[in-house]
Amino acid sequence: MNDFKGKTVIVTGGASGIGKSIAESFAKKEANVVIADIDELKGKKLEEHLNQTRMNSLFIKTDVKNETEIKELITKSFEAFGAIDILINNAGISKFHSFFDLTVEMWEEVINTNLRSVFLCSREAAKLMKQGSCIINLSSTRAVMSENGTEAYSASKGGIAAITHAMASSLAEKGIRVNCISPGWIETGDYESLREVDHKQHFSNRVGKPGDIARTCLFLAHPENDFITGENITVDGGMTRKMIYEE
C-alpha cells in the first residue's frame, strides 16, 4: 500500500540539494509535490523532470523571507491540490561571517531565511491542514556544535529545533505532528571528490548523502509513525557522538 499517493507535500528550498532529493522521493511515492524555491530556473527544471512521468508536481517561486510570498505559496498549493498534508521546511542559507564583522543586516538575512520562514510557513499551512497532517523542519547539528563565525547560522538552527517542540504542543489539538531533522555533513556536490579521511571521521564510515535525509522525511511523514512528535532526529553518521582528543 502506498500511503503517500495523492497526498500533497510542500518542500521549501526544493529545487536543489537536500530539498530536491526530498521532492523526488515523495514524487516517486506518487504524492503531489509543490517545489517552493527562489531559484526559478532550477525549480522549473525539476518540475518538468518530475512531470515527465506523472502530472503531480508544481513549482511556485517563493522567497521565504517574504511573508506575502509565503501566504501565496500556501494558497496556490491548496488551490492546486485541494489539501496540504505534509510541509517540509527545508529552505535555508549558510552564510558565515567573522563575529566582529557580523552586521544586523547579515544576521537578519540568515534568521529570516532559516528560522522565521519556518514559523510563517507552518502558521499558514496549519490553518488548512487536517488531522493526521505533519510538519518536518530541517535544523542542523550546528545547533549543538560550532566553528568560528557561525553565530547567525547556529542561532537559526537552534531556534528551529526549539520551535519544533513548541509547535508540536500548539498544534497537537489539531492532530498535526511536528518533528525536526538535524543533518550532519550531507554532501550535495561532488561526492567522489571526498577524501578517505572525510568518510572515516564518521562512525558510519561515510559522509552523508541527500537521500539519507529524504528517507528520514519519508519515515517521519508516514502515518504509521503517528506516535512521534516534538522530536529532533540527528542524522549525521554518528559524527556528533564521536569523542575527539588532540594527538
Model-derived regions, located:
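Active-site helix of classical SDR
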Residues: 122, 156, 164
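C-terminal helical subdomain
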Residues: 180, 196-228, 235-237
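Residue(s) in the substrate-gating loop at a strand-loop-helix junction
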Residues: 140
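Substrate-binding pocket helix/loop in short-chain dehydrogenase/reductase
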Residues: 98-99, 106-111, 198
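Short C-terminal tail/terminal secondary-structure segment
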Residues: 145, 229-247
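Alpha-helical segment proximal to the catalytic Tyr-Lys
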Residues: 127, 169-173, 226
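Canonical Rossmann dinucleotide-binding motif of NAD(H)/NADP(H)-dependent dehydrogenases/reductases
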Residues: 3-33
